[in-house]
């Protein structure tokens, strides 16, 4: 999610930098080159570790949903220690810090690194944007909530859908499911308001509403 946002911002003409850790080999360099192709600053990326984390995407058809298989065990970023990230250096001159729920789900150490980044952002008046982006194949509801509820106290703008409300924050304030989002706008609004009630530091909550009839 983070790289997609960086690419989108760079494509719109904004300055965007990406922080992660990649193996110092041709595979890691190929990933960096792909980001550079869109104008993303990769100078802050840490180098080292054994391998690049990947996932396999099975495209759905008709009413059969898509399927994702993660292969991230032993990746450079999952094995990185939080102490490797010098946030004073990495966030120098930055106005907005974006992260998704996928990143702290990678490992406990990376969750700690994200929290340290958010503490720095709050102390230095850097706005924090968080896409909750719950992924059930990466962590359980209980683990996600234990981590994300703590991180939410530093978030200025939260992006969430109905599954994120409950799975990540334990907020049950909607009816139905994401496939019928447009028909449930009032329920979504209730969920957003509850986020702001529980996390008054969060200035705005955004979501995408849609009705899904096919995955094609």
Q: Which stretches of residues belong to each language-model region?
A:
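Anion (oxyanion) recognition and catalysis
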Residues: 10, 36, 115, 119-123, ...
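Conserved N-terminal subdomain of the carbohydrate kinase-like
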Residues: 15-101
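Hydrophobic beta-strand scaffold residues
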Residues: 16, 42, 128-129, 159
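Charged helix-capping and loop-helix junction motifs
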Residues: 84-85, 111-116, 141-149
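A short helix->loop->beta-strand "cap" motif at the edges of active sites that frequently abuts
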Residues: 120-127, 199-203
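Conserved phosphate/ATP/ADP-binding segment of small-molecule kinases
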Residues: 138-216
